[in-house]
Amino acid sequence: MAPKPLRIGVMLEAVQIADIIGTDILGNPSAHYARETSAMGLPDFSAHAPEMKFIYPATTLDRIFVTPDIKVMPTHTYDDAPRDLDILLIGGPMLTHRPEAADRFMKEAYAKSKIVMTTCVGSMWLASAGVMKGMKATTNRECLPIAKSLHPEVEWLDQRWVVDGKLWTSGGAGAGIDMVGTYALQTFDPIFVWVMGLKLLDFDPTARGQFYKDPPQWPQAMLERDWAKLFAGGS
């Protein structure tokens, strides 16, 4: 009996398109892509390539927009999307984008999914679902003071990406690409991933590594502002 396809959920409603570019790194080592590229004369990696099914949930099945004004058709709503995913990748929307159905989906999917990844401020979106208490995590580096103010229950670290059990969180979009690439190298056949998932896209997650090489530079006004009050409706 053939193994079940890997189910990969991608939360992209109202996010930066760059936040979910790592999806391509996951998709390139798929059986479908291996068959397509072998037909072009590239090495046949199909024996190493799993079947994959990508799931794109949103509030409704209407077209959604990601930057810069790209229109995407969801495959599921948050209410009917499967929760037991192999990988859930959460991009980063504005901090005012918090659909209740999305919070329910993240809470239930976090409990049942094997791996949960966030990029940029997607970690704050996941934290709003109440599942990250006591976890080590990161977010967009420029937004770490905001994250610490809004979600003090999380141990926020100043790193390009952080791994805590099944939770993988990254800083900005570039760090997210490197994080997904690192996960793919550790999870799938590394030669296959390097050739099909990274080199073809000119990505190298080892070039900058997991840790920042320069100190953070947060404006004092950002450190002093009451972000929790602001997003609760204050000023």
Regions found by a protein language model. Give the residues of each.
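Extended, subdomain-level signal for the structured scaffold at the beginning of enzyme domains
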Residues: M1-V116, M124-A127, P145, L157-D158, ...
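Short, structured coil segments at secondary-structure junctions
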Residues: P50, K112, V131-K133, H151-P152
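Short pre-catalytic strand/loop immediately N-terminal to key active-site residues, enriched for Gly-Thr
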Residues: Y110-A111, V163-W168
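Structural detector of well-ordered beta-strand residues that form the stable sheet scaffold
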Residues: V116-M117, T138, L157, W168
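Short, glycine-/small-residue-rich phosphate/pyrophosphate-handling segment
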Residues: V131-S149
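The feature captures the short pre-catalytic strand/loop hairpin that immediately precedes
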Residues: V154-D164
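Short glycine/threonine-rich catalytic loop with a Thr-x-Gly-x-Asp
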Residues: T169-G174
